[in-house]
UniProtKB/Swiss-Prot annotation:
Protein name in the entry: Sirohydrochlorin cobaltochelatase
Lineage, uppermost ranks: Archaea, Methanobacteriati, Methanobacteriota, Methanomada group, Methanococci
Recorded metabolic or biological pathway in which this protein acts: Cofactor biosynthesis; adenosylcobalamin biosynthesis; cob(II)yrinate a,c-diamide from sirohydrochlorin (anaerobic route): step 1/10
Sequence similarity: Belongs to the CbiX family. CbiXS subfamily.
EC number in record: 4.99.1.3, 4.99.1.11
Amino acid sequence: MEALVLLGHGSRLPYSKEIVGKVAEKIKEKNIYDIVEIGMMEFNEPTIPQTINKVIAEGAKKIIIVPVFLAHGNHTKRDIPQILGLIECEEHHHEGEGGHHHHHHHHHGEKIEVPEGVEIIYRDPMGADDRVVDIVLDRAKGN
């Protein structure tokens, strides 16, 4: 069984989760993946660990994770891989970031136990894809 998990940033406002949820619904309708779920980086539930644990419990053997972010950043390069257990958690001292200390609540307390035989595949964010360019041009025209 294959699961697709879309990761959103999350927000104190409802829009981030709503958009990721709508994208997930549209993907579900295509019937490509057995399971399609969303997980939120911060502020909202389901958290990333909640979602991953849920799809594992539902029998997913291959979990494809796509961050619904435009660009790589600290979240996609460090925080999410740490939550997924793909890289070690390090004490992050933001050297060279001008004392930029922001302590997010990243649900680090929750653990993901990945059983034997379950594969987690973590993909890149959207990037400057031509389809993103088309959307920007549509928005510029007021469409």
